[in-house]
């Protein structure tokens, strides 16, 4: 058993030794083959690298040679071009030298001719001075003077002709424009009426209007400032007042009282207050109406109200609002005919008399007041100038201001447009009221009875009873010294204390 194992081990050992030996021999042989093959590959690679190296060197030499040859050819071409350019420059230089010589020769020739001409000119000038007996300066002055006189004569003749043609054409053109404008406009003619008539249902109503001891008629006259005349006119009462606003308030109030039938001082006061508010609203509506008719927008409320007040104002018998509207239409048409600013001309013409609708105690004329109001209304400076210059109080600054003056003159000069007697009468009554209202403590003054009576309402807190007579005398003396009037003027002072209490 042991022997078998030993034999087996020996056999295994021998087998392993033989296998290892065979493996070593095979590896050595294979390594030798690989080395030979690697050496062969290396030799081939070296040969190929050497071949490529020679090829690259050869190509590089050929490239360098080609570049060198090309550079040499380029250099030869540049040298040839430079030589040709140099030859051309030399030729040009020679030509310029020749031309310069010719120019020098011609310049010398011209100088010689110039000197010869100067000598000839001097000789001829001396000969002319000897023949004419005038020196050069004298002859020049004589010629200039003759030419100047001739030019002045021709210029004056041309100026005269232009002025004559311009005057003729301007007059004809202005006439055509005015005729065309006046034909395009139609204006209502309104007269200044200082009295209104209120129809009564019966004669008995006159007694109710007068009231017990005249209380009703006195209250109506005191509240409205109008003169209520109850005479023999059948079924009619006459209301007289120079202020159209107060006359309108009195007329409407009396008509409503007659229609209502309740006529007593308290009812009269209530109706007058309500009618006063309605008339104030009508004033604003009249201003809006004329603005709408003329197509004017962006007017401030105070301006609209001032325009509306012109509806109740008259100037020489002419309604001021209608007059302003007519002037605005005329000015806009004139502006369109001559190419001026139509909007500015129309706006300035409408506002030119707005100062007459401003309630103020200032002694300035209506043009100054209107110009100040237009400036406060942020109107265009040309509109402000047109308002202030329509009576030449200031210098017009633009053609639109002149157009407003022309349109104002056309409207005022239209036959039947104005009546001066009525305006003088109204002015006298306004001055009469202004004198009384100028005293301290006077609240309101009304001229009635065609200016023969002045009723003055005084403040009972400022004027006690003991001073009423003295105030009346002062007002009468002031009227005597400041106004001229026919007959006598009755001054009546009214001082009233009213106490109102409520029982609860």
Swiss-Prot record:
Q: Where is the KH domain?
A: 194-279
Family designation: Belongs to the RNase Y family.
Q: Which residues form the HD domain?
A: 320-413
The uppermost taxa in this organism's lineage are: Bacteria, Pseudomonadati, Spirochaetota, Spirochaetia, Spirochaetales
Bilayer-crossing regions: 2-22
- The EC number of this protein is 3.1.-.-
> Which biological process terms from the Gene Ontology are attached to this UniProt entry?
mRNA catabolic process
Role: Endoribonuclease that initiates mRNA decay.
Q: What organism does the UniProt record list as the source?
A: Treponema pallidum (strain Nichols)
Q: Which InterPro entries match?
A: HD/PDEase_dom, HD_domain, HDIG_dom, KH_dom, KH_dom_type_1, KH_dom_type_1_sf, Ribonuclease_Y, RNase_Y_N
Q: How does it sit in the membrane?
A: Single-pass membrane protein
**Annotated protein name in UniProt:** Ribonuclease Y
> CDD domains annotated for this entry?
HDc, KH-I_RNaseY
List keywords of the entry alphabetically. Answer: Cell membrane, Endonuclease, Hydrolase, Membrane, Nuclease, RNA-binding, Transmembrane, Transmembrane helix
């Amino acid at each position: 058993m042991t022997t078998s194992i030993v034999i087996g081990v020996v056999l295994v050992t021998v087998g392993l030794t033989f296998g290892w030996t065979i493996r070593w021999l095979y590896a050595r042989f294979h390594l030798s083959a690989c080395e030979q093959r690697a050496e062969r590959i290396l030799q081939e690679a070296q040969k190929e690298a050497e071949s490529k190296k020679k090829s690259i060197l050869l190509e590089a030499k050929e490239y360098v040679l080609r570049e060198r040859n090309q550079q040499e050819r380029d250099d030869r071409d540049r040298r040839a071009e430079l030589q040709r350019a140099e030859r051309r420059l030399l030729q040009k230089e020679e030509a310029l030298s020749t031309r310069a010589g010719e120019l020098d020769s011609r310049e010398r020739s011209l100088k010689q001719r110039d000197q010869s001409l100067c000598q000839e000119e001097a000789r001829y000038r001396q000969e002319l001075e000897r023949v004419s007996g005038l020196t050069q300066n004298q002859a020049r002055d004589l010629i200039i003077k003759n030419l100047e006189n001739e030019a002045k004569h021709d210029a004056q003749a041309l100026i005269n002709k232009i002025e004559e043609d311009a005057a003729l054409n301007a007059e004809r053109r202005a006439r055509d424009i005015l005729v065309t404008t006046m034909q395009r406009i139609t204006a209502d003619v309104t007269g200044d009426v200082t009295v209104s008539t209120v129809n009564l249902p019966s004669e008995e109503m006159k007694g109710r209007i007068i009231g017990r001891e005249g209380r009703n008629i006195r209250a109506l006259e005191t509240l409205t400032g109008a003169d209520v005349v109850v005479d023999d006119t059948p079924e009619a009462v006459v209301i007289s007042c120079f202020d159209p606003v107060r006359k309108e308030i009195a007329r409407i109030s009396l008509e409503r009282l007659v229609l209502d039938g309740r006529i007593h001082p308290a009812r009269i006061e209530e109706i007058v207050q309500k009618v006063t508010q309605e008339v104030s609203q009508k004033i604003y509506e009249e201003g809006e109406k004329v603005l709408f008719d003329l197509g004017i927008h962006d007017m401030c409320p105070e301006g609209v109200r001032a325009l509306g007040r012109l509806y109740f104002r008259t100037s020489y018998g002419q309604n001021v609002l209608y007059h302003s509207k007519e002037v605005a239409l005329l000015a806009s048409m004139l502006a369109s005919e001559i190419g001026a600013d139509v909007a500015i001309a129309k706006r300035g013409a409408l506002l030119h008399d707005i100062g007459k609708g401003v309630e103020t105690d200032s002694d300035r004329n209506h043009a100054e007041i209107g110009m100040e109001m237009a400036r406060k209304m942020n109107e265009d400076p040309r509109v402000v100038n047109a308002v202030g210059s329509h009576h030449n109080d200031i210098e017009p600054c633009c053609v639109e201001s002149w157009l407003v003056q022309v349109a104002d003159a056309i409207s005022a000069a239209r036959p039947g447009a104005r009546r001066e007697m009525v305006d003088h009468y109204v002015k006298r009554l306004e001055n009469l009221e202004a004198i009384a209202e100028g005293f301290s403590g006077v609240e309101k003054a009304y001229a009635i009875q065609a200016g023969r009576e002045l009723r003055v309402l005084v403040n009972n807190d400022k004027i006690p009873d003991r001073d009423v007579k003295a105030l009346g005398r002062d007002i009468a003396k002031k009227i005597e010294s400041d106004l001229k009037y026919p007959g006598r003027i009755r001054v009546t002072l009214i001082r009233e204390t009213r106490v109102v209490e409520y029982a609860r």
